[in-house]
Amino acid sequence: MNGNRFVGFCAAALAAWTVSAQIELVAPADGATVRQMHTIQREYAKAPWAQCEKYFDGAENSKKLRSRGSTPVPVKLQWKGDATEYQVTVRRMPDGKVVLDQAVATNCVEVDSLDIATEWEWTVSAGSDKLVSHFKTEDRLPRLVRMTGSNNCRDIGGRRGLGGRRIRQGLVYRTAGLNSNAPVEYYSTDEILELEKAGKLKEMGHTGRALHRKLKTGEKLSSHAKKNRLVKRKCFAPGKRRFTDEEVARILKVYGIRSDIDLRSDDECYGMTGSPLGPTVTWFHISYRAYSGAFTEEGLAINKKVFGVFLDDANYPIVFHCIGGADRTGTVAMLLEALLGVPEEEIWRDYLTTGFVGVVSDPPHKKSFGDAVKKLKEYPGETLADKAEAFFLKLGFTKDDVQRLRERLLER
């Protein structure tokens, strides 16, 4: 090697060493446990069951809880260094699944919606140097996930079921609607008053007659047209998109969704021909009956269709939802979690987590959900899981089907 080449080689080596010497991983500390929930979300999640209902009584605690919504707290990865670009990679351990692989020009990057109670490896590299560290996500339910544009999004996984086995994470997600409901146009308050003046309001069906009686007794109408519920034009276009193209691509990459179980009515899904997540996702449109309605003859037939989707391994990962992710979605989640052996208290916790976005935080919702749980308890069996199995057998599934579903969704 001649002198000039040798000097060049040494300079390059020194530059690489300088990058290495100046990179310092700052946070999280190696081996640290990180949180993915806001403080008030954590307080609710870890509170004794007897204290949980204070968060859903319409008081200040409930308002504070709703102020944070259902968004997860991102894990912030920080380091020191003066390189112009870094490659940051985050892997789930021990399987090594990559959840982030990104080139950045800053000294910080955020990652969210990680599996709970899981060890993660993160690396930062610049030039030929690579520094490695590890952290663990807190064992705190629920696993909130981000789908920017929708809300009330979470993994049903992580909860413990039969034999203390966790429900597998990353297989079944419950959310609010992936697009808006089909629009409905309502008569304004002024238009309703004109209809009453013309003698036409009482001829406009049940809602028109009810509004007519209100006006005759001197009761005031709501200033919000939707609350008066007199339909002028019903479902005339598909619901608006909630996701950008970029967010759809991210959702598919991060969560790998293959199937979308849409529990909304035909009217709500007017004009839709597929999932808002695109053609790679199979859309199962199954109009659902919530709460006690799930146990009627019609409800049983509907449940057979819904849970038939869960029995096909090719359909996973699955997202299921209605529009708010509370009533119909909550009933499906309750039946599935009960079958997997989740304790009743934890099933209630999952349902009431929807209070993070201000739904179900009132007595009527809780009564309706309680009535559905009571209906399930009418089935034979010693435990709630036994009763859920009897319910699934009533739907027409076999014991082998039940066992196969449990093995698919519970960790070994």
Which residue ranges define each predicted feature?
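Ser/Thr-glycine-rich phosphate-binding loops at phosphate-binding pockets of nucleotides
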Residues: 324, 328-329
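N-terminal signal peptide c-region/cleavage motif recognized by signal peptidases
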Residues: 16-20
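Bacterial N-terminal signal peptides that target proteins for export
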Residues: 1-10
